[in-house]
């Protein structure tokens, strides 16, 4: 079917496909740098084990080993993905050289991310940022909740440094910077004290957010998690803790939900409208959990589509929902992992924009539930793919799976030589 034919079919149900395409082009999605090197970073031994209850599996050849390689890989992904992009950085991706020699995480400065800023500015990209509270000798294994004052002070200073870096990135790039605070602090077995670590965690975040910043430019987030490897019994930053902290401090931070950080029977799609009933702004990490926070590559599955439906229906595209990707798969080609996930979130958003949401809402309000089911099911066989192809063409990126040929050539010419 041609795009014009698909356009007519959608017009028959009250949907303007041209308007949907134009709207989607303006929606920024933050591409996570850590897929490219399996979350290793550049500030400590790249062969160190991951800590914080997270794990990368696989050893597919071609992992980025230097900032230059990582940026080159990201450039390939950018050329294959439609829409507006940001780059999401972790503090462990600081770039050190003769002019700016290595410093520890509590001493990081904006200059250690100048090359990332230049990279983004040259491509018209925004940037988001994350303090890195894992895979470091100062994890004891706790960080911001540690009873050890020296440990806690180190990580508080790291968080304050990251506030300054986020402010720098936002000012230089002219776009708000979401700065996400997440730690893997917790215990493997039943703790004797659940409140003490949370009191310390709260005090630590309070001190981090006392660092001056413009809340219109820097959006500190508090992210929760249900459990991780080695912290099965208790997580300091639980869902209740993180959400309550954000609600209590809504003048200086926003909540962030990662759809892999909840019990497997919970769905973030249902939480989005609940939070937007109270918060003017929230943030999301979109991933694909399989039985736990496994961070598989995002597919065009039911929950991804439901998440994007709620973003669109709740007015999230008007600056109320900050969307970022967060997954890491080392068992497949990393360029493909990035590209598949990014394009799938875009597909899910486009599908939501091609839904006659006002008409469906009216059916629900009028309690015409039989017709609502019929109309919703009919949408599943609409010619969405033809509209998606037109969107890709209008963004000057490959249509269908044509992009994979570029990835295969890049693997032959570049990635295969990284040995």
Question: Which sequence ranges carry the predicted segments?
Answer:
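Alpha/beta catalytic barrel-like cores
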Residues: 1-147, 154, 164, 175-177, ...
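Structured alpha-helical segments in the cores of large, soluble enzyme domains
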Residues: 71-79, 119-126, 159-175, 200-214, ...
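Active-site groove signature of glycoside hydrolases
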Residues: 166-192, 218-219
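Short linear capping/connector segments at secondary-structure termini
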Residues: 184-186, 225, 327
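Acidic/histidine-rich catalytic cores of soluble enzymes
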Residues: 188-303
């Amino acid at each position: 079917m041609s795009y014009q034919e698909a356009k007519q079919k959608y017009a028959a149900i009250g949907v303007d496909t041209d308007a949907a395409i134009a709207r989607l082009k303006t929606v920024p999605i933050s591409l996570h740098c850590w897929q490219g090197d399996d979350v290793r970073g550049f500030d400590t031994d790249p062969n160190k084990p991951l800590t914080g209850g997270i794990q990368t599996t696989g050893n597919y050849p071609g992992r980025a080993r230097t900032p230059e390689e990582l940026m080159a890989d990201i450039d390939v992904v950018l050329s294959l993905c439609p829409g507006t992009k940001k780059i999401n950085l972790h503090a462990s991706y600081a770039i050190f050289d003769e002019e700016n020699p290595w410093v520890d995480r509590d001493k990081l400065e904006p200059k250690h991310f100048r090359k990332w800023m230049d990279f983004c500015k040259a491509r018209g990209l925004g940037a988001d940022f994350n303090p890195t509270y894992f895979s470091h000798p100062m994890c004891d294994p706790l960080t911001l909740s540690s009873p050890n004052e020296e440990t806690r002070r180190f990580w508080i200073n790291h968080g304050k440094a990251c506030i300054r870096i986020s402010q720098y990135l936002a000012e230089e790039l002219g776009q708000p910077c979401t700065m996400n605070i997440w730690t893997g602090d917790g215990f493997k077995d039943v703790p004797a004290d659940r409140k003490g670590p949370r009191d310390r965690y709260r005090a630590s975040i309070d001190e981090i957010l006392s660092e001056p910043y413009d809340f219109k430019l820097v959006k500190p987030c508090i992210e929760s998690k249900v459990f991780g490897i080695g912290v099965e019994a208790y997580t300091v930053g639980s869902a209740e803790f993180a959400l309550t902290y954000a609600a209590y401090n809504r003048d200086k931070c926003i909540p962030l939900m990662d759809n892999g950080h909840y019990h497997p029977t919970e769905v973030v799609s249902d939480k989005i409208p609940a939070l937007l009933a109270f918060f003017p702004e929230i943030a999301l990490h979109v991933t694909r959990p399989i039985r736990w926070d496994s961070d598989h590559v995002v597919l065009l599955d039911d929950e991804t589509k439901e998440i994007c439906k709620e973003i669109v229906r709740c007015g999230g595209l008007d600056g109320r929902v900050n969307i970022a990707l967060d997954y890491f798969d080392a068992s497949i080609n990393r360029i493909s992992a990035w590209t598949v996930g990014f394009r799938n979130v875009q597909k899910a958003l486009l599908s939501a924009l091609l839904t006659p949401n006002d008409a469906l809402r009216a059916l629900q309000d009028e309690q015409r539930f039989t017709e609502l089911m019929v109309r919703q099911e009919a949408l599943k066989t609409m010619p969405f793919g033809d509209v998606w192809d037109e969107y890709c063409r209008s963004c000057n990126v490959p249509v269908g799976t044509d992009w994979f040929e570029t990835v295969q050539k890049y693997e032959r010419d570049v990635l295969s030589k990284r040995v």
